[in-house]
Amino acid sequence: MKTMLAAYLPGNSTVDLREVAVPTPGINQVLIKMKSSGICGSDVHYIYHQHRATAAAPDKPLYQGFINGHEPCGQIVAMGQGCRHFKEGDRVLVYHISGCGFCPNCRRGFPISCTGEGKAAYGWQRDGGHAEYLLAEEKDLILLPDALSYEDGAFISCGVGTAYEGILRGEVSGSDNVLVVGLGPVGMMAMMLAKGRGAKRIIGVDMLPERLAMAKQLGVMDHGYLATTEGLPQIIAELTHGGADVALDCSGNAAGRLLALQSTADWGRVVYIGETGKVEFEVSADLMHHQRRIIGSWVTSLFHMEKCAHDLTDWKLWPRNAITHRFSLEQAGDAYALMASGKCGKVVINFPD
C-alpha cells in the first residue's frame, strides 16, 4: 500500500502529521499531486485553536477530523471512470466546497451556499490539500492558466476568489475611489484586484503598520492609514472629495465595518467580506440618509473563480507576490503557528516536484 504524509488539526493550537494511504479515484474523481496549499484565516479561527461550530448548529463542529487544507492546487496524476473534461497532467486548482450540484445555489454556481445533501468542504468535512495527494471531484476543478504558478492557484481557490467576488459585487470600475479596511491576505488581494479593475484611487486601513508597508511595496495602495488615526472618515472624505465610492471591509471587525460604512460617499456601495462578528450603526444617519448600499459577499462562484484566474493573467497581477512565508508539509506546525500570530502576509505549504 502506497502511503503519504498528511496534516490534521486536533485542536489546542497543534498540528498532527500522519502517514495515511494514498487514495484511489472513483467515478468522476481525480487524484491530484499537490504542489501548493494555502492556509486560510478560517482554518485558524474555526479549527486550529479549537474546533468551533456555528450558531445554527452549536453541537456540530465544522471540522470533522479530515486532512486539513482548503486552498489546494496541483497536477492531475490519475483519473477515475466518467471524467470527461480534464486529463492527466493538467494543472488545476480546486474550488474548496463540493456541493450537491442540484440545489438552487449550486445551480447558480455557488457550492459555498449549497443547501443540499452531501455538501462538504475540502479540509473540513472531507480530506483537503495538506497532504502529498488530494482526491477531488472533477466538477470542482478549475484549469490553472499557464501564466499562473501553483502558489497563485492555491491563493485563488479561496482568498483571492473571495476578494474578487467582493470587487464584482461592489461594481468597482475606473471612476471609483476604493477603500479597503483590513489588509490581511483577502484585503491585500481586494486592493490588487481593484487595481486590475482600474480603480482611480485605492485607500487601505489596518491596525498594523507592517501591512500598510507591504501594500505600498506591492504597489496596490495609493494611500494608507492606521486604523487608530483620528477622524478617518473625514480624512477620507477630503481625500476623495466626498468619500469612497466603494468600501470593502475585510476585517470582520465591528469598528472596521463601521469605518467602511461611515467613509463611503453618498450613493456609495459598502461590501462586507470579512467573516464573523457584528456591527452596530444608526440606520438613518449612517445608511439611509446617505443613500448607501450594504452588500454581503461570501466567497465566490465556480464561474467567477475561473474568470478571476484569467483576469489576473490579463492584468499581469500575481497573487504569489503577497506570500510572505513558505513551508514544507513537515513544517506545517510552524506554518500554522505563524499564521495564528498574525505577523505575516499569506502563508503556503509547498510540495517538491
UniProtKB/Swiss-Prot annotation:
SMART domains membership: PKS_ER (SM00829)
Annotated InterPro entries: ADH-like_C, ADH-like_N, ADH_Zn_CS, GroES-like_sf, NAD(P)-bd_dom_sf, PKS_ER
Molecular-function GO term, any one: oxidoreductase activity, acting on the CH-OH group of donors, NAD or NADP as acceptor
Name of the gene encoding the protein in the UniProt record: yphC
Residues annotated to bind Zn(2+) 1: 40, 70, 158
Residue ranges that the Swiss-Prot or TrEMBL entry lists as coiled coil: none
Chain segments annotated as transmembrane: none
Protein name as annotated: Uncharacterized zinc-type alcohol dehydrogenase-like protein YphC
Top-rank taxon: Bacteria
Family indicated by similarity: Belongs to the zinc-containing alcohol dehydrogenase family.
Residues binding Zn(2+) 2, per UniProt: 100, 103, 106, 114
Keywords: Metal-binding, Oxidoreductase, Zinc
Enzyme Commission (EC) number: 1.-.-.-
Cofactor binding note from Swiss-Prot or TrEMBL: Binds 2 Zn(2+) ions per subunit.
Cofactor(s) needed: Zn(2+)
